[in-house]
Structures are given as C-alpha cells and as structure tokens.
Amino acid sequence: MLGSQYSNKKRKRGMEAPPQMSFSEQEHLLWTDELLDYFMLQNSNEPLPQPPEPPQTIDLNRPVDDKGHTPMHWAAAMGDLHVVSTLEQRGARLDCQAHNGETPLMRAVMFTNNWDKQTMDRLVDRLQGTADMSDWFGSTVFHHIAATTCSKSKYQCARYYLDILLTKLGEIWPPEMLTALLEKGDHNGDTAIILSLIHI
C-alpha cells in the first residue's frame, strides 16, 4: 500500500520518489512527509498536533529535501526544541551538513523562528559544539548571521542571535578562540564583520 501511495509521486520537497522502494525507504518517506507537514503547521493558525515519532529503524541523518537538509536542520530552523531533543536522543547528529556544508546552527540563524520563540539560548546550549564549523564556502555561523542583515527587518533578530552566541561561546571558549572565529574569512576573504558593514 505504501509503495503505490508514493510510486512516481513528486514529493513536496522537490525530490522525486524512486519508482520502487524498500519498506524502510517507504517508512522514511512517510515519516519525513509527516514531519515537514508538522513544521509547516507551525506557521499557520491551525491547532498544532504532536510531532510524529520517528520509526525505530529510520536513518535520522538522511536528507529530507533536495538541498540535503536533515530533520535536525529543519527542527533547529523552526526553533522546535522538543523535536531537536527527540532527534538527539535517538542518535541524530548535531553536526550534520547539508549539500552546501550548512549545519543546523547555521540554518537556524537564517530564520526568525528562534527569535519569535525566544529559544536561541537553549538551542545554542545544544549546538554550541558545532559553532566553529564552516560550510563549503568557508562561511561560519557568524557569516550566516551577517548575511541576514541585508534585510533591515531582520536587524533585531540578527543582533539577538549574535548576542546569544557571543555570550554562550564566551563562557566556554578562550577569548582568542572566539576572536579567531569572528575574524575568519570566507573563500572571498570576507569576515562576518565585513559582511555586516556592507549591509549597513
């Protein structure tokens, strides 16, 4: 039944379902569709159901969209700490990277959900171990925050994310380590500070 339901079906995330799938693949597809539906309901006025429980045999680090984002990327971006916690307890990696090298923490700062919910401090508590990672363009989480400042409507959100990260990392990192990350250039040689100044 599951096979016929998803056979040759264009998935909502832009990924084509293979014509023939194993039961585990069908199970993964069904769960990820339900999970993304759950996330989408958070932006609507409809009553929010409980998030779908991942099947025991599912690979939680497998991408769920055509950009290579995993369930952890989505949960972090939506500011859903319950799902983040559930995924972590079930063995999902906090340092998973999308096709462009983006981490869940980087993904989170690109959206305002953690600002709207005031959840960034608790999210950083879980993801701070990935704060020194770079994507394939050499960009750090601070570059990603700086990139959002091209929209004036996101200034306050970006400042909130920046303050949280600086405070949390400052509590556990030596000052020179934090300074080095802030001064790190991407593949164009631009630091997060330079990008922020460009957008002012």
Which residues does each PLM region occupy?
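Ankyrin repeat boundary signal
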Residues: L60-V64, L94-Q97, A131-S134, E183-G185
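Ankyrin repeat domain, specifically the short helix-to-loop turn at the C-terminus of the second helix
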Residues: P52-D59, S85-R93, D121-A131, D163-A180
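Conserved small/polar residues in nucleotide/adenosyl-binding loops
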Residues: I198-I200
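Fungal intrinsically disordered, low-complexity polar regions
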Residues: M1-T57
